[in-house]
Swiss-Prot record:
It comes from Coxiella burnetii (strain RSA 493 / Nine Mile phase I). One of its GO terms (molecular function) is RNA-DNA hybrid ribonuclease activity. The keyword Metal-binding applies. Monomer. Residues 5-146 form the RNase H type-1 domain. This is Ribonuclease H.
Length: 154
């Protein structure tokens, strides 16, 4: 485990989908000082990007008070969306540069509300490249899918 600063929450999140759309899952690994918490869930019919957003939302929602947070994701869609594209989309009335509606607008709006509660630094890591915490988040996301499939909801 890499050395971590005290009093900062480290949130590692990932989304996964089997088929796109298809059954999907999200996973979150949270670390704060010596404490660790794992969260996961799944949805019967979703997309990979929706699960990436949901992972970040659920991780941030789980924090009971405003915090300093370092979020690590392997999703450029999530990282660039929240740090670069969101203000532009809002200025354009939730339209992309080619005038089409932004996909997943309700999730982006929910994520923005959660982000506003905290001071966040966003990091991107290459997926499936051996980053230990990202691999755990990926395993949790896949557990979410497995649980959805086990329930027989497709």
């Amino acid at each position: 485990m890499a050395k971590q600063e005290q009093n900062i929450v480290y949130l590692y999140c990932d989304g996964a989908c089997r088929g796109n759309p298809g059954p999907g899952g999200w996973g979150v690994l949270l670390r704060y000082n010596q404490h660790e918490r794992q969260l996961h869930g799944g949805v019967a019919n979703t997309t990979n990007n929706q699960m990436e957003l949901t992972a970040a939302i659920e991780g941030l929602k789980s924090l009971k008070k405003p915090c300093q947070v370092v979020v690590t994701t392997d999703s450029q869609y999530l990282r660039r969306g929240i740090t670069e594209w969101l203000p532009v989309w809002k200025r354009r009335g939730w339209r992309t540069s080619n005038k089409k509606p932004v996909k997943n607008q309700p999730l982006w709006e929910t994520l923005e509300r959660e982000v506003e509660r905290h001071t966040i630094v966003w990091h991107w890591v290459k997926g499936h490249s051996g980053h230990a915490e990202n691999e755990i988040a990926d395993e949790l996301a896949n557990r979410g899918i497995d649980e959805v499939l086990k329930r027989g909801v497709q």
